[in-house]
Amino acid sequence: MRMDPFIMVVIALLVMSSSVVVHAKRVEFSDVSRSDDTSHIIEMIQQINESMLFSFHHGLMQFGPRYTGTASCNLASQYIYDSFQAMGLSVEFYNWKMKGFTSRNVVATLEGIDPNSTAQYILCGHYDTVKAGPGADDDGSGVAAVLAIASVLSHYQFNNTIKFITFSGEEVGTYGSFTYARDASHRGDNIIAVLNMDMIGFANTVEGGRVLRFFPPLRSRWIAEYATTIAEKYQDMLDMTVVTLPSYPGDDSQAFVDYGYDGVWIAHQDGYPYGHSANDTADHLNWTYYTKATKLMLAITAEIAQRPIDVEVMLLRPLEGYLYFFKRPVRQTSFADFWANGMRGRTFIIGGRTMASAEVFSSEPIRYVVFCVDGQFLVWDSDPPYEWRIQGWFYPLIGKHTIEVYAYTTSGKVASDEMDVIILSLSTTYK
């Protein structure tokens, strides 16, 4: 069997490389305080109830199993579209084709009111199922929660934009979220966080009835930390706790992480014995727990979408998921099936000094912007445009590396972003 020369180079570089773990946080907010006025958030939380959730959930369940590409899956997407539209939200189908599947995501948008903010937050779930079952928990629970939260938040205004998205293609390879994340990256969408609710409707222990689990990659742990703070803030009302565990690469948030965004999978704690089967039905859900989990997710979404961002930095170049050859992007890489090893969205740089550029949004003056590789300082820039030609200092960059950028304000606030790259270049600053 002949192998594509590009794939051969990729394999060689991966063999030569070692993994590097870096913790990035693209934004810094003002502190969340228990003394903040919470009356409007409490008002929103109180509007979520079991009857509302049951109504949205039953509407989705009426189509039976919703395997991607089938008529029942398409009918379910129309139901979701009509539900968003009835809320007065801007809504669209996001069509995609991949690996023999043709389907569509449903995207509803609640525009932010801050004219200086391009920030987006995504609250999502997947409406497709396996062939065998109706998917009451996996992931009818997440989709109905998205709809319930959207129905409440649509009556309020927030500084930053919220997108409510239901994906198809999750059970066949997370193809719906992959295509959306890839396209969002190429558009330059300023997505701050992706909150993916996938199986949030079950509890059969006292402890499990009070816990919602967050599975962030290291770079996105700040989301779980923020959610923990919000859970503590509304503890007396909701009796819910956030527990943080290591990430799992098979959910819809991972596609966004692969393309340089922050995201987290959110699920119940107790093991669910009916998953991926004909027994994944509504009568097996714990509706009391499910309602509390949805209320907590509303509070987290509303709090984070309203809070002003003090400083944010984005790595704009090189483009995520491209092959660069002597400083020029020559082709888009295609690793849609490589979700388990982080190859989706990976950027490859061969030869030359490719330009890295960053954009900073800040409510106060920027002191400087620092570019690093694998956690080591290489260059700083005090004036926009913030740019750097990617190269080693004394030695070439060869293999797998992480490019980081840090933006420092005059008051000491810091935001950072990162990009995983595979490089084969002999360029150095000092010969």
Predicted ranges, named:
Residues 1-30, 313-318, 405, 421, ...:
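Secretory targeting signatures
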Residues 24-71, 110-111:
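N-terminal hydrophobic or amphipathic helices/low-complexity stretches enriched
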Residues 55-111, 239-240:
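A non-catalytic alpha/beta surface segment that caps or lines the substrate-entry region
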Residues 66-68, 97-101, 112-116, 127-131, ...:
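Solvent-exposed loop/turn segments at secondary-structure junctions
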Residues 205-312:
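Active-site-adjacent substrate-binding region
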